[in-house]
Amino acid sequence: MNYDVVIARYGEIGLKSSKVRARFERKLVKNIKAAIDCEVDRNQGRIYIFPKNYGECLENLNKVFGVVSYSPAVSTYGNYEDIEKTLGEYVDNLVDDGFIGKDTRFAIKCRRVGNHDFTSQEMAAFCGSVVVKKVGCPVDLTNPELKIYVEVRDDEAFIYHEKIDGPGGLPLGTQGKVVVLVSSGIDSPVAAYLMMKRGCEVIALHCDNAPFTGPKVHENFDKIIDQLQSYAKGVPITKKVVKYGEYLQQAKDCAPEKMTCVLCKSGMYKIAEKLAHKYGASAIVDGSSVGQVASQTLSNILATRHGVDMPILSPLIGLDKLEITRIAEDIGTFEISKLDDGGCHAVPKYPETKADVDRVEEACRAMNQKEAIEKAFDSID
């Protein structure tokens, strides 16, 4: 098929006010151009992409947030004669590619924008007759095996038969910055992805727990960020690493051992908050899911967030491990996250699962947490 345009559609952007909608459209176009070598036109709720490489376009458009669906199409003039000629050629290609034959039930879906001397129904009936004459296949408006779409917009027409799902969401970079705590595990990369899908620019903060973790953890983190960068065209992820091993050692030496994981998470939040203030981010994000591990009981979630004034968002909070894993598989981070990296050896045998604010504050004082956080923060690279 000799496509000459790809039609991209957005969803909730269209529900915004005209001013916000225009701003979001401009950002979406900018991100599309960052992902694809192309020219782009905007017109009445559609984005028309003219790529130099159609294979690259179809592959990368699936990773541009804000795009709900897209269709490779052929264009022509919006009159009966040109539509008949172009549709006939289009159907010939569908026959050659095995999409339609004399027994294929089909339907024409026509949409029209602008002033014309025909209605959408009249154009649909006309296009249907073109297909029947070409192939001899039956029309079935109720349960068609193939839908052929004809969009007539002012003096142009577009013909296509596929609607490919995009990632949806909002254009990346329209909702401000967030600091995401990203490990080499399964959950936090998914949390970062979901915040990107909601339009947030991501600053990924990784806590390097060496010597309690091995070099594989850091290597896998780098691979995960590289994979997530494929969804961040136009607004790349900023990667930051804090040396966190000394903080953990101080927590283990000065506070009850069972509080290690609680103090670890508390320190992460406070370092992330300082980083957020430095880079103008508005929230902290983590991969917490209620009850999944010891540090994610409701008691611990409350206690570890004490002393942090910035919003802490947990997009996975109500998802189970299977749901999170499915998303990780879809976005390409699961195969990296499941690699054996040795884990963290600072985890106590019996971690605290019912922490309260008073005991956490006492443990923070015992380890001189404020000083330890300042020292760790200065190590961020």
Curated annotation (Swiss-Prot):
Keyword Magnesium: no
Reactions catalysed, as given in the entry: [ThiI sulfur-carrier protein]-S-sulfanyl-L-cysteine + a uridine in tRNA + 2 reduced [2Fe-2S]-[ferredoxin] + ATP + H(+) = [ThiI sulfur-carrier protein]-L-cysteine + a 4-thiouridine in tRNA + 2 oxidized [2Fe-2S]-[ferredoxin] + AMP + diphosphate; [ThiS sulfur-carrier protein]-C-terminal Gly-Gly-AMP + S-sulfanyl-L-cysteinyl-[cysteine desulfurase] + AH2 = [ThiS sulfur-carrier protein]-C-terminal-Gly-aminoethanethioate + L-cysteinyl-[cysteine desulfurase] + A + AMP + 2 H(+)
NCBIfam families: tRNA uracil 4-sulfurtransferase ThiI (TIGR00342)
Domain of life, per lineage: Archaea
One Gene Ontology MF term: CCA tRNA nucleotidyltransferase activity
Task performed by this protein: Catalyzes the ATP-dependent transfer of a sulfur to tRNA to produce 4-thiouridine in position 8 of tRNAs, which functions as a near-UV photosensor. Also catalyzes the transfer of sulfur to the sulfur carrier protein ThiS, forming ThiS-thiocarboxylate. This is a step in the synthesis of thiazole, in the thiamine biosynthesis pathway. The sulfur is donated as persulfide by IscS.
Binding-site residues for ATP, renumbered to this chain: 181-182, 265, 287, 296
E.C. no: 2.8.1.4
Family label: Belongs to the ThiI family.
UniProt protein name: Probable tRNA sulfurtransferase
GO biological process terms, semicolon-separated: thiamine biosynthetic process; thiamine diphosphate biosynthetic process; thiazole biosynthetic process; tRNA 4-thiouridine biosynthesis
THUMP domain residues: 55-163
Keywords: ATP-binding, Cytoplasm, Nucleotide-binding, RNA-binding, Thiamine biosynthesis, Transferase, tRNA-binding
PROSITE patterns according to UniProt: THUMP
Stretches assigned to coiled coil: none
Originating organism: Methanobrevibacter smithii (strain ATCC 35061 / DSM 861 / OCM 144 / PS)
SUPFAM superfamilies for this protein: Adenine nucleotide alpha hydrolases-like, THUMP domain-like
Main location: cytoplasm
Xref: HAMAP family: ThiI
GO cellular component: cytosol
Known pathway: Cofactor biosynthesis; thiamine diphosphate biosynthesis
Localisation: Cytoplasm
